[in-house]
Design a protein with these regions (language model features):
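Structural boundary micro-motifs
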Residues: 1-112
């Protein structure tokens, strides 16, 4: 896959392999036979840490991620179905995303 500025990426940050993030490519530099990929939030990654990349953010979502604070139940080509009612959300209506790995990392778990 050829990476280009403006693509969305699902990746593991260099400093933490405990969770997965989603961001957008801001700049790409080739240095010593290695691509350095700068993201909008100032993260720097290499291809080794990429999981998926696409111009359509829906392509890199996974079931269990959270879109607009609701759990993704199903993913179709142009929409995601979220929440218990499986409401459709299109690309243009996506405002925020939390990956299921991020949610697992930050969740407070009760021992009963």
């Amino acid at each position: 896959m050829k990476l280009e500025v403006g693509m969305y990426v699902r990746y593991k940050p260099l400093l933490s392999s405990k969770y997965v993030k989603i961001n957008k490519i801001k700049e790409i530099e080739e240095k010593e036979n290695c691509l350095h990929i700068w993201l909008e939030d100032k993260d720097l990654i290499t291809e080794k840490y990429l999981i998926k990349a696409s111009y359509n953010i829906i392509d890199i979502l996974e079931e269990g991620d959270y879109v607009n604070n609701e759990r993704v139940e199903e993913i179709w080509k142009e929409i995601v179905l979220v929440g218990q009612e499986c409401r459709p959300i299109s690309f243009n209506n996506i405002k925020s995303i939390v990956t299921h790995e991020q949610m697992e990392q930050i969740a407070y778990k009760l021992d009963h």
